[in-house]
Amino acid sequence: MLIKQGDRLINTRNWSELVKPEQISRDGEVSDTMYGKFVCEPLERGYATTIGNAMRRVLLSSLQGAAFVAVKISGVQHEFTTIPGVLEDVTDVVLNLKQVRLAMDTEEPQYLELKVDKRGAITAGDVRTNQHVMVLNPDQHIATLTEDIELTFELEVRMGKGYVPADMHEGLSEEIGLIKLDASFSPVRKVAYTVEQARVGQMTNYDKLILEVWTDGSVSPEDAIAYSAKIIKDQISVFINFDERISGENSNGSADSGEFNEHLFKSIDELELSVRATNCLKSANIALVGELVQKSENEMLKTKNFGRKSLDEIRRVLGDMGLDFGTKVDGFEKKYQEWKRKQQHEA
């Protein structure tokens, strides 16, 4: 559909004729709280790779998470030393601390303590947390005491995104003995995607995107992909330089209630469509134009024996009436009955 907007002519078919996935399905048989397998289809050829690559990059780099950013160990002046009575040197202890996964419900820095006094293994579960912080992998090894000595760790936790080197943290104390840590804040541990062939009606030249997401448990895989999609949407929307509400719809995506399009009350038989298209609509129990326009293109393509040729034919007819697929018509049945009564009264 060509619509004039100011001194420009906007061709809405640039996007309206593309197939769009109606929803994302989750494979419940293999998914859990830390792993999700999602299927998105159908997509235009090549779009699965484009979307999958963008989602993967954002998932791994841009989501907020919590991590230790600094530690102070009793009796330790710097990272390149050893601790009497501890099997690991300080460098190894620091590396182990970086592997501890945390969940935090506040943006304010939190200060935790780990205190031990008996020989044996020290794990992340020994950290004394508070109401704002949770250790997600309590079995993560930190150090091993070979003697009964008292050892204290003072730990600072912050929220952030991506990977932040130790010297890039802002506002940390410069006191002697405070060891700054490289922090991997991302709650997403791994992302993989594959592209397969999808079918729409009789056509098979479409894409299916299969996206797999592994998280540390601080965010669900479902929320992780939702956040990444929101980030991408917000970043690219600035490129749209025209009013998106240009297809005869108001801001709610509904038919304009000021001038109700009476073409909506037409019978399918009045459209002079091909026999094949008409029969397909009737087999789908679509009798009126108002019922037809509320269907999405994807819904129509799933109708038995309904193909791209019939879709294009119907879209052209609807366009001539100032209508299109995917139009929300609030209270259509009520309006149709009122219109029928009015027609009968005038007759």
Swiss-Prot record:
Keyword Metal-binding: no
Name of a matching Pfam family: RNA_pol_A_bac
Cellular component, GO annotation: cytoplasm; DNA-directed RNA polymerase complex
InterPro entries in the cross-refs: DNA-dir_RNA_pol_insert (IPR011262), DNA-dir_RNA_pol_RpoA/D/Rpb3 (IPR011263), DNA-dir_RpoA (IPR011773), RBP11-like (IPR036603), RNAP_asu_C (IPR011260), RNApol_insert_sf (IPR036643)
Gene3D superfamilies tied to this protein: 5' to 3' exonuclease, C-terminal subdomain (1.10.150.20), DNA-directed RNA polymerase, insert domain (2.170.120.12), RNA polymerase, RBP11-like subunit (3.30.1360.10)
One GO BP annotation of this record: DNA-templated transcription
Region (Alpha N-terminal domain (alpha-NTD)) residue spans: 1-243
Superkingdom, natural source: Bacteria
Gene Ontology MF term list: DNA binding; DNA-directed RNA polymerase activity; protein dimerization activity
Region (Alpha C-terminal domain (alpha-CTD)): 260-347
First-level EC class: transferase
Catalysed transformations (reactions): RNA(n) + a ribonucleoside 5'-triphosphate = RNA(n+1) + diphosphate
Oligomeric and partner information: Homodimer. The RNAP catalytic core consists of 2 alpha, 1 beta, 1 beta' and 1 omega subunit. When a sigma factor is associated with the core the holoenzyme is formed, which can initiate transcription.
Family: Belongs to the RNA polymerase alpha chain family.
Notes on the domains: The N-terminal domain is essential for RNAP assembly and basal transcription, whereas the C-terminal domain is involved in interaction with transcriptional regulators and with upstream promoter elements.
Protein name in UniProt: DNA-directed RNA polymerase subunit alpha
